[in-house]
Amino acid sequence: MKLFRMSSDRFETVYADISDGSKPAVRFYLMVTVSTLIASFGLILNSTAVVIGAMLVAPLMTPIFGISLALVRGETDLLVQAIRAEIGGVTAAVIMSLALGLALGDFEPTNEILSRTRPNLFDLLVAVLAGFAGAYALVDEKISPALPGVAISTAIVPPLANSGLCLALGEAAAGLGSFLLFLANFLSILVVASITFVLSGMAKRFGAREAGANLFRRFQLPVVAFVLITAFLGYSLFKISQERKMAVGIR
C-alpha cells in the first residue's frame, strides 16, 4: 500500500540519511552532549527559547527513525545499530545533565522543569503529531525535514535533561516522571513513523498475507508498550483534572 508517493531515488537518499544518522559515532555523542547542555541551561534559566535552540543540534530523533525503518523492513543490522545509538545517546544525556546539576549545586526548579515532571495524554498527542510531521517530511522531498526535526527533538532531549536535573535535586519521582515523558514520546514517534514508512511503500515487498504477519510479529512489543503507556497517561490526565477541580472547590 502506497498512500504517499516516494521515488526510488528519494528512498535511497532517505535510507542512507537514516542509516548514517543512526550510527553511534563520536560526532553523534558530541552533538548529544552539546544539545543536552544547552537544553539543561534552558530548563534551569526557565527559557523556552534556549530549550528550543538546543534542538537545532539534537541528533536523537534519527535513531528512532532508524528503529522504525528497521522494523518496517525487517533489517536486523540497522535495528541493532539504531538501538545502540539511541540507548547510548539517552544514557549520555541523562548522565550529562545529572553531572551538570550536581556541579551547579542547589538550584530552584523552574516552571520549565516542573512542567515536564507529570506527563499526560496531551503530551502523547503532541509527540504523535510531531512524529508524523518528521516522518512525512523525510518521505516528501518537497518538505524540509529541518523544522519537523526540531519539533521532534523538542520532545526527546528536554525530558532527558530534565530527568538528570531532577535527580541532581534529589527528586527521584520527578526524574522518573520526566523519563516517562521521554519514553512516551519515543514510543509515539516510533509507532507513527513506522506507519508513515509503511504507507510510503518503504516496507520490503512480500505477499500481502506474509507482509502483514511479519509486520505484526515485529511490532507486537512496541504497540503493546504504546497502548499501556497511553492508558497510563490517560489516567494521569484524569487525576490532574480531578485535582484541579478539588482545588477550585476548596477556593
Regions found by a protein language model. Name each.
Residues 97-101, 161-170, 227-236:
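Hydrophobic alpha-helical transmembrane segments in multi-pass integral membrane proteins
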Residues 190-219:
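Cytosolic-side transmembrane helix boundary signature
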